[in-house]
């Protein structure tokens, strides 16, 4: 069976080389190692440079230069470094160990193993005939891998012939920004702790995943009872796994968003891996709460691992990036609406709290899929969410009809999250799964658009709930505690969401009264 590569403490270097021609496996190269980095120059480039130098010397000695040779000589003599500077820039993270990801990855290369591209100089020369140009946008491809391309956008103001010089100057400056480029690709370093390697996300083999103890959350949600029992999980049913999974997801996301200062941008079921064998015994990670599981006081790995950082972006990288289509910033992703997934369509730019919103969607989907339709608990959850959206329940409507109505309502609510809709007071029975209130909190987070760090810091460190506590930090099970996820020190009540839970009278059936508005979320407990 395929065994996962151990990326712990694995150093990452970067291949940085320049080329006028695409680099192929068969291309002869000159290789030099400098400071544990490998510099590759294709032999063709060296031969061309030597030929150019020889031609220049011959031309200078003979003094028989035509116009083309004069132009070439002037360019080579005046811009001795420009020939290399205008070549393609390739920054490739390289592991010291040999790994293989998929079928296209070469030995020792990871993710960004494709050669970069630049616009043809001749094409730039053709643009010089335009007399006036206010702004010219030029995209430089700085990386390409399994999950798309990453561009660096250059904006130059120009008029007439100066356009050519400015664009060439911008390309030369790219070669001097190696440190900045490494910051862009620094997301690849996260694979050492946050990336679970498989043979390919699109073709994960169920037997291999079970053999090594990991399954994707998407697989876990789509299993039937027979498949789930074959996993030999210590849990008797999947509903028991909800709290441990969410707890571990929050810790992993905390490590990504806060500690490493990244936004994942693609948090979905297929990119979350769960170790079902350690989920029941794993305690909250002490210290930093790293998603790798290496806390200051514990050697236990976090049972939930985030994967596929192809869309991740470092928050403080001072380079503007474009998506695959060259659009500024990143557009939000589209998730399809079926039994296991929501359909979320929005054209707004992704912000640093996008991962928080995706986490709320995951909780919503886990709730509806871990509890099968037709059961009493599932029906109660669906009815509650429908009431939350102000939808009256038809007495003759069955679980499937209510579920379909809920999908439409929830999808519309997300799509119109900037609306000024005022929700009404809801009274419902307390026998519903407590996790249902959490999705309301996350929806409220996204409506108020708080900073991602505020939410995660509150989830992890609010009151006594820290990474040293075994209780899931997003659940409050002590009647003396308050749940203040935004800012515990804030004097503005409208910016604080309270969630309290009284479990002292387990035999009683209390009634919950929830008042939900766009600016506040209060939950009071009234025993009948």
Curated annotation (Swiss-Prot):
GO terms for biological process: signal transduction. GO terms for molecular function: ATP binding; protein kinase activity; protein serine kinase activity; protein serine/threonine kinase activity. The keyword Ribosomal protein does not apply. It comes from the Eukaryota. It is an enzyme of class 2 (transferase). Residues 49-77 have a biased composition (Low complexity). ATP binds at residues 142-150, 166. It holds the Pfam family Pkinase. Residues 49-84 are annotated as: Disordered. Keywords: ATP-binding, Coiled coil, Kinase, Nucleotide-binding, Serine/threonine-protein kinase, Transferase. This is Probable serine/threonine-protein kinase DDB_G0282417. It comes from Dictyostelium discoideum.
């Amino acid at each position: 069976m395929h065994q996962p590569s151990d990326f712990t403490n694995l150093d990452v270097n970067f291949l940085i080389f320049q080329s006028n021609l695409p680099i192929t496996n068969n291309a002869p190269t000159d290789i030099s190692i400098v400071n544990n980095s490998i510099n590759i120059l294709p032999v063709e480039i060296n031969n061309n440079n030597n030929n150019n130098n020889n031609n220049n010397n011959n031309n200078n000695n003979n003094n028989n230069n035509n116009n083309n040779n004069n132009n070439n000589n002037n360019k080579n003599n005046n811009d001795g470094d420009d020939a290399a500077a205008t070549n393609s820039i390739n920054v490739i993270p390289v592991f010291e160990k040999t790994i293989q990801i998929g079928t296209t990855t070469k030995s020792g290369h990871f993710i960004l193993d494709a050669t970069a591209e630049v616009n043809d100089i001749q094409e730039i020369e053709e643009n010089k005939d335009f007399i006036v140009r206010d702004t010219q946008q030029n995209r430089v491809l700085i990386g390409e891998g399994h999950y798309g391309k990453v561009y660096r956008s250059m904006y130059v103001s120009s008029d007439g012939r100066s356009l050519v010089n400015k664009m060439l100057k911008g390309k030369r400056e790219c070669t001097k920004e190696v440190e900045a480029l490494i910051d862009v690709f620094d997301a690849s370093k996260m694979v050492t702790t946050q990336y679970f390697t498989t043979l390919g996300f699109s073709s994960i083999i169920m037997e291999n995943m079970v053999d090594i103890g990991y399954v994707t959350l998407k697989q876990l949600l789509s299993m039937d009872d027979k498949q789930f029992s074959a996993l030999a999980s210590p849990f008797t049913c999947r509903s028991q796994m909800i709290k441990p999974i969410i707890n571990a997801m929050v810790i992993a996301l905390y490590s990504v968003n806060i500690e490493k200062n990244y936004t994942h941008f693609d948090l979905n079921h297929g990119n979350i891996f769960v170790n079902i064998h350690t989920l029941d015994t794993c305690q909250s990670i002490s210290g930093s709460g790293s998603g790798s599981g290496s806390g200051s006081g514990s050697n236990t790995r976090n049972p939930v691992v985030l994967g596929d950082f192809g869309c991740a972006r470092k928050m403080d990288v001072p380079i503007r990036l474009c998506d695959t289509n060259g659009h500024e910033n990143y557009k939000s992703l589209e998730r399809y609406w079926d039994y296991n997934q929501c359909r979320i369509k929005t054209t707004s730019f992704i912000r640093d709290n996008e991962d928080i919103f995706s986490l709320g969607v995951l909780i919503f989907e886990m709730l509806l899929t871990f509890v099968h339709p037709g059961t009493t608990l599932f029906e109660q959850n669906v009815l509650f969410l429908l009431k939350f959206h102000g939808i009256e329940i038809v007495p003759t409507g069955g679980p499937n009809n209510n579920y379909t109505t809920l999908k439409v309502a929830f999808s519309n609510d997300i799509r119109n999250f900037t609306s000024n809709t005022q929700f009404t007071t809801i009274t419902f029975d307390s026998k519903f799964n407590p996790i249902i209130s959490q999705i309301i909190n996350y929806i409220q987070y996204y409506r108020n658009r708080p900073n991602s760090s505020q939410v995660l810091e509150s989830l992890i460190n609010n009151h006594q709930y820290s990474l040293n506590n075994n209780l899931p930090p997003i659940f409050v099970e002590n009647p003396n505690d308050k749940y203040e996820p935004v800012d515990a020190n804030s004097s503005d009540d409208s910016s604080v969401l309270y969630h309290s839970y009284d479990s002292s009278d387990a035999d009683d059936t209390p009634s919950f009264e929830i008042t939900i508005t766009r600016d506040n979320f209060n939950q009071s407990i009234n025993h009948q």
